[in-house]
Design a protein with these regions (language model features):
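Nucleotide-activated chemistry modules centered on ATP-dependent adenylation/adenylyltransferase
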Residues: 1-313
Length: 313
C-alpha cells in the first residue's frame, strides 16, 4: 500500500499519476480538511476537484495501480499524539512550522500512514539559489537528509523534534518543478487533467492568480497562461501595481478575492502575507475599483491608464 497526500492540486495530482504508473500496489489518497480551508470555502473546491479528477485518472492509459477512494478527514478527528504535539509545541516558532498550518497535523497523520508522499515541488528555475526550495532548505538545515526517493534520514546531530514532525513523510518531489510535471503529463497524454487541478487557495470558482499558491505557478512566465488565463492577467496587473507601490498590489489582491469589489470602512486582511489593518472611504473604494477595472480592460497596455486621472496619487 502506498499513501499520497492529495489535495486535487497540480503537484499532488502529478505525483498520484506518476506513482500509479509505476506500481501495481494499491494507492490510498489522503486529504485533511483544515478549519482554515473549510472556513474560506477552499476545502469544498479541492474535494470537488478530487471528485472530478479521480475517475479520469483511473481511466488514463498507463495507470497500473488501484487507486482507492480518498480518505478525507477533518483535522479535529485525527487522534492526539503526545510525542508529536510536544515536539510541535517546542518548534512552533520556527518559520517552517509557524507559517505552514498543514504541518500542525500532517506529520501526526503520517504516523498512521507512514511514508505518505507529499507533493511539494522544486521552485521555478532561477528563483532560488541552486534551485533548492524553501522546504528542502529548511528540513536539511536541521540536520535531516532527504534521500532520492524523498525519505528523511536523521543525521547524527540532527534536530529530533523536527524529525518527529516530518520523519514519517516522504518529500519525493523536491527536485521536480512544475515544468517537469507539465512535460510528463503531456508525454503520458494526461493534458485533460491539468485544467481540473485546483491550485488556488481561495473560494473563487477560478484560480485567482494573486494568492501565494497561484503566484508560484505564475512565476513560470507564460507556462500556465493557457491553463489559467484569468489568473495570468490578474498576476500581471498585480506585478504592475508592485512597481508603483506594494500597498496597491495588496489592495488589488483583496479586490480580486472580493470578486471585483472592495469594502469600505475598517477591515483586516492577510493578502500581503501578514495581517494588516485598512480603512478605506467609500470615495477611495470607488476610485480604486475604477482604476483596477481599467487596468484589466487595457491589459497589457497599462501605460494607457493614468491613475492621476482617477484621483489616485
Amino acid at each position: 500500500m502506498k499513501y499520497i497526500y492529495w489535495s486535487g492540486g497540480l503537484d499532488s495530482t502529478y505525483l498520484l499519476c506518476k506513482t500509479a504508473r509505476n506500481t501495481t500496489e494499491e494507492i490510498q489518497p489522503i486529504y485533511i480538511i483544515f478549519p482554515e480551508t473549510r472556513s474560506r470555502g477552499a476545502a469544498d473546491l479541492e474535494i470537488n476537484a478530487q471528485n472530478d479528477l479521480l475517475p479520469l485518472i483511473r481511466a488514463e492509459d498507463g495507470i497500473t495501480a488501484t487507486i482507492l477512494k480518498p480518505i478525507q478527514i477533518k483535522e479535529e478527528e485525527i487522534p492526539h499524539d503526545i510525542e508529536f504535539e510536544s515536539a510541535y509545541e517546542r518548534m512552533y516558532n520556527e518559520d517552517i512550522i509557524s507559517k505552514h498550518y498543514m504541518y500542525r497535523s500532517l506529520g501526526k497523520l503520517a504516523k498512521q500512514y507512514p511514508g505518505i508522499m507529499i507533493g511539494i515541488e522544486a521552485p521555478p528555475p532561477g528563483t532560488r539559489e541552486n534551485n533548492i526550495g524553501k522546504t528542502e532548505n529548511a528540513i536539511t538545515s536541521y540536520g535531516i537528509k532527504i534521500e532520492e526517493d524523498g525519505t528523511l534520514i536523521l543525521e547524527e546531530n540532527g534536530n529530533k523534534d523536527i524529525y518527529t514532525i516530518f520523519g514519517n513523510m516522504k518529500f519525493c518531489m523536491v527536485h521536480i518543478n512544475a515544468i517537469d510535471e507539465l512535460n510528463e503529463l503531456h508525454e503520458w497524454g494526461y493534458d485533460d487533467l491539468i485544467p481540473l487541478c485546483r491550485t488556488c487557495c481561495t473560494a473563487l470558482p477560478q484560480q485567482c492568480g494573486v494568492c501565494s499558491n497561484c503566484e508560484i505557478k505564475m512565476r513560470y512566465g507564460d507556462t500556465f497562461k493557457k491553463y489559467m488565463p484569468k489568473a495570468y492577467v490578474n498576476y500581471q496587473v498585480k506585478q504592475y501595481l508592485r512597481t508603483i507601490e506594494e500597498k496597491y498590489a495588496t489592495l488589488y489582491t483583496i479586490f480580486v478575492w472580493g470578486s471585483g469589489h472592495l469594502n469600505s470602512g475598517k477591515f483586516t486582511s492577510n493578502a500581503s502575507g501578514q495581517v494588516e489593518n485598512f480603512y478605506l472611504s467609500t470615495n477611495t473604494v470607488n476610485k480604486l475599483e475604477t482604476w483596477f477595472n481599467l487596468l484589466l480592460d487595457n491589459y497589457p497596455n497599462f501605460d494607457k491608464v493614468n491613475r492621476a486621472d482617477y484621483g489616485i496619487e
